Amino acid sequence: MILATGSRVRLLNIRVKDLEAAAAHKFTLSITEPLTSLKRLRVIFDRNGFWTEDAGAVAIESLEDKRLVGTMQFYRSGPCIHGYEIGSILHDEYDRGKGYASEAVRLLTDYLFAQRPGCHRLQLIIEEWNDPSARLAEACGYASEGILRKAGYSSEDEPSDCFIYSRVRD
């Protein structure tokens, strides 16, 4: 099902044909489980289609060639927070810098605020070294709130500090 359409990309519910590409990226469909097994991905897909009240995953598809260029997820960031955290990844270096990610973040932000009345806050957590994602957050209307110390996960040796960005319902 198409969730939202922009000028470059559209967001869709995850489809069976998206699972193989998603499997190449550990945390692209779930932040709590590194999903790289096609068999495990299919079990979850068959159970709930990667869509629940508390979390969901979407495909980012290029309008130009109908190709899967990335995936996004949203999930409850905490039991007392009235909103979600959003994560995204473009699967191929080739697709970066084309505006796909920023449009996808804007589309999912608008979708969640429109479709989930109890959602009052969306947040992005971005590791300190990731300048392109920090610029993307600001370009999409997210405000920097501060630093989460030792919250990053990209290094196995030492967790890194992260910036937290949020956008609240108008």
Provide a role label for each language-model segment.
Residues 48-54:
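Short loop/turn motifs at secondary-structure junctions and domain boundaries
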